[in-house]
Amino acid sequence: MKLSLLLAAPLGTLAADCTREFLKSAADSLLAAQAAGDPSLLKPVGSTLEYNENLKPATFASGILKTALKVDHSRHSLDTTQCATYTELISATGPKPYVNGYQLWFTNGSLTRFDGIISSTGDWLFNVTGTLHWASREAWTEIPADKRDTREAIKAGGDAYLDIFSDKSVVVPWGRPCSRLEGGAYTGNGGANDRCDVGIPDNVKLTNRRYVIDEVMGAVSIFLTFGSLADSHEFRLEGGKLRFVHTITPMGGNPGPSVGKGKGKGKGFRRRGEVL
């Protein structure tokens, strides 16, 4: 399904320099489309569009946007350098729970690539109650201009975290506190001593990385291949140090471990590398 270029033109004209305002408007239209189950509300869409879900080709007709989801929590990252967005969406109170990540990529003011990482019951450590509980308590606020890290530093921080899965000699800019929300499990309790350097497996390569970087939020979204699985890792850095890590890992129909029905607090639970 594609919108006409006539519909896309007004926003496309405004987006000539890819402003934060344009990107937020487009990302908000994604939320509207997902809430209504109506892909035509996603704007502006180009005359050609590459559409992927869980790193596999899909279409609007068969994809997640055809399912109306109650949006209980959402957050955007806006990358004006690459003209791209990342959106985290948690749907906890609808008929079927979801925790999804979306990267949207724009060319000449129109959407030309859609990537979704879609997770639900049975996926890695899935517990939407825990995800919503912790995500809604974290502070992902704008970082003052004089305290922002560079794009290069933000990307390097995310890459270092991912690289340590295959090379334990990598120096990762761990923050303290640093909290990881993995599925619905949390490596702490929201306190000053939270750590996210626990439960990291060995000898697992995280490849095919695609980045959306927002210096204003200190955030980088990375879609990647985790062994054989589609995966989303998102990081927030503050003062050059990792502060928050969010992960989404669909299991491709192979049920993953759960963390029960509680808030998902735990340490040392990350063992994906042993089962791929």
List PLM regions with ranges:
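C-terminal and inter-domain tail/linker signature
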Residues: 13-276
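Fungal secretory targeting signals
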Residues: 1-17
